[in-house]
C-alpha cells in the first residue's frame, strides 16, 4: 500500500518535470503544442507511461509529435536524473491521451442536444 503512494508521488513529479523540460529545454517545433496530462508508473518504478495531449487534431501533427517525443526520450531521462533524487529513472514510453478527444466529443454531443431542445 505504501508503494502505491510513493509511485503516485513520483509520477506527479515526473509529469511536472517533463512539462518543464518540454517548455524550456526541447527546441523541436513538433512538440510546442504538447502537454503532459498523466504519468502511470509500475509498482517497482521501472516503467513510466507518459500520456500527452496535443492541441491540433491533425493526424500528421500527432505522428510528428509522437516521433519527436520518442526522439527526445534520452534528453528527458538525463534531465530527470539531474532534477530528481530517485535511484533509477524509469524507462519512458509516450502514449497519446485519448480522454481529451473523448471529452470533447461528449461535450459536442451535449451541446447538440441542448441546441435541438431549444427548437
UniProtKB/Swiss-Prot annotation:
Subcellular location per the Swiss-Prot or TrEMBL entry: Cytoplasm
Example of a GO cellular component annotation carried by this entry: cytosol
Presence of keyword Disulfide bond: no
Coiled-coil annotated residue ranges, if any: none
Pfam families: RBFA (PF02033)
Biological processes, Gene Ontology terms: maturation of SSU-rRNA
An MF annotation (GO) of this entry: ribosomal small subunit binding
UniProt KW Chloroplast keyword: no
The entry's keywords: Cytoplasm, Ribosome biogenesis
InterPro entries named among the record's database cross-references: KH_dom-like_a/b, RbfA, RbfA_dom_sf, Ribosome-bd_factorA_CS
Subunit structure: Monomer. Binds 30S ribosomal subunits, but not 50S ribosomal subunits or 70S ribosomes.
Function: One of several proteins that assist in the late maturation steps of the functional core of the 30S ribosomal subunit. Associates with free 30S ribosomal subunits (but not with 30S subunits that are part of 70S ribosomes or polysomes). Required for efficient processing of 16S rRNA. May interact with the 5'-terminal helix region of 16S rRNA.
Record family assignment: Belongs to the RbfA family.
Record's protein name: Ribosome-binding factor A
Gene from which this protein is expressed: rbfA
Amino acid at each position: 500500500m505504501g508503494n502505491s503512494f510513493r509511485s503516485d508521488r513520483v509520477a506527479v513529479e515526473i509529469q511536472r518535470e517533463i512539462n518543464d523540460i518540454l517548455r524550456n529545454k526541447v527546441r523541436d517545433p513538433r512538440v510546442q503544442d504538447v502537454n503532459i496530462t498523466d504519468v502511470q508508473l509500475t509498482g517497482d518504478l521501472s516503467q513510466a507511461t507518459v500520456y500527452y495531449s496535443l492541441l491540433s487534431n491533425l493526424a500528421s501533427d500527432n505522428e510528428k509529435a509522437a516521433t519527436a517525443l520518442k526522439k527526445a526520450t534520452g534528453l528527458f531521462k538525463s534531465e530527470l536524473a539531474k532534477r530528481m533524487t530517485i535511484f533509477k529513472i524509469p524507462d519512458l514510453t509516450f502514449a497519446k491521451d485519448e480522454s481529451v478527444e473523448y471529452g470533447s466529443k461528449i461535450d459536442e454531443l451535449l451541446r447538440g442536444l441542448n441546441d435541438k431542445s431549444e427548437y
